[in-house]
Amino acid sequence: MPLNLSRNQIIIVSAIFGVVLFLVLVFLGVIPGLKEQNSGGFFGQGEQIVLSFWGVENNDFLMPFFENYQKIRPNVRVDYKQINENDYEKTLINALAAGRGPDIMMFRGNWLPKHADKIIPASENQITFSRFQELFPTVAVSDFAPERKIYALPLFVDTLTFLYNKNIFDAKSVALPPKNWNDFQNLVPRFNEIGPGPNRQVIKSAAAIGGSEKSVHAAGDLLNVIMLQFGSQLIGQKNRQINFGEPEEKAFDFYLQFANPAGQRYTWSDNLPYSLNAFAEGQTAAIFDYAAQIPLLKKKNPFLEIGVSFLPQLNPEKPVNFADYWGLAVSEGSKNAAYGWDFIVYSLADQKTAEKYLEVSKRPPALRTLIQKFANDPDLGVFARQALTARSWPQPDNNKVKQIFSNMIESVLTAKLSRREALQKAENELNELY
C-alpha cells in the first residue's frame, strides 16, 4: 500500500535520513572533523599521521607532551629528533632549504626577525591573539606575536638572575643578596681580593660582570638588560634602527666600571677563567645567568651551594628583566601544519600538560597560571616572577648581535677604541643587519 505523505512529511523524513547518513559517515571516518575528543579528536582517527619534531630538549622531558597528545589523537604519532644545540640552527636551516625539515621545531625567542619566513602562523581557529595574551607573559607576545599573528608558543621562559655562592656569602657575613645595583656596588669591596702592583690582578672576584663574551657567559644579555633598565629602547619603534644615545652611554659606562683596574668597583678581567668555571671553582662569588646553567654548574661542582636571587634593578619599583627561552613552531613547508599546531596548542596551552613538563625538566614556566602557581617555589620562584617583567627587542640575527656587543666591550677593555667610538661602531654594525 503506497504511502501518501504530505510535502512537509517528505521533508522531515528526508532530513532524518540525511542526519543518520551523516552520522554513519562520521563514525566510519569518511567525514573527519566532528568526532568527540576521546575518540580521536576533531581531526578524526581514520588517517594515520606522523609528525616529525626537531629540537634541542631532552627527549625524556618532552614525553608528557607525546603521551598526553596520543590519548586524544590516537591516530597521530610524534617522532622527536634531539639535536645538539650548537649544531641545531645550521642543521635545521639546511634541512628546511632542502625540503627535508620537520613539521614541528623548537624556535628560539629571538629568532622571528631572522626566520619568520620559515614558519607558518597559527590560524584563529587554533588560538586567537587575545587568548595568547591571556595565557603567556608580555615578552612572549612581543617575541612571537608582534603583529597579532602567532608564530610560536613558548615552551618555557628563562630569565637572567643573580646566582651566588651561599658559602662565600656566609663567610663574608653577607646575609642577603643585593636587591638593586647600588647594593651590589657596595658589596663589591667585601668580596674582592686584588693583587698588589700596578696591574691589580683579580685573585677573588665579587661577580663576573664587565667583561666580554670571551670571559663572561651571557655578557651581551647582561649589558642589554642594563641598557633597558637605563631607559633604552635599543631599537626605534618607527624606523627599526639602532640609535645609541645617552641611556646606552650611561649603561655602557656602568657596565665597564667593573672591569676598570683604575676604578673603585673593579672586580673582573677578561683574563680571568670563564665565568661559569670561575663560579664553580669559587673564584667569583656570583654570576648573572639563567636557570639553564644551574645543572651544568652542579655537574662541575656537586658541592656548590647556589643561591638564586632577583636580578639587581636600577629602579626596583619598575623592574626590567631579560628573557632567553625556546618555543614551538610549525614549519612553513609542513604537510601536516594543522596537526602540528594542534599538538603545540594542546601541549603548551593546557596547564596540566605543561606542568608535567615542568616537573621533569625543571624549566621555569611560561603559562601565566603556572607562573602564579610557582611564584614562591624555592627552585623556580625567582625565574617565574621575573618572567612577568622580562623584556626583549627584535634582533635581526641573534648570533651576530651577540658578537657585536662582545666586540664593543672588548674594544674598550683593550683600549682599541674609546667608549663613544665603540658604541658608534656597534651602532653602525647593528644597523647593517636590518
Identify the role of each PLM range.
Residues 45, 61, 292-296, 314, ...:
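Mature extracytoplasmic/periplasmic domains
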Residues 46-57, 76-81, 104, 207:
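Short, well-ordered beta-strand elements
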Residues 124-136, 206-217, 228-250, 299-300, ...:
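Short, solvent-exposed loop/beta-turn-alpha elements that line the ligand-binding surface or hinge
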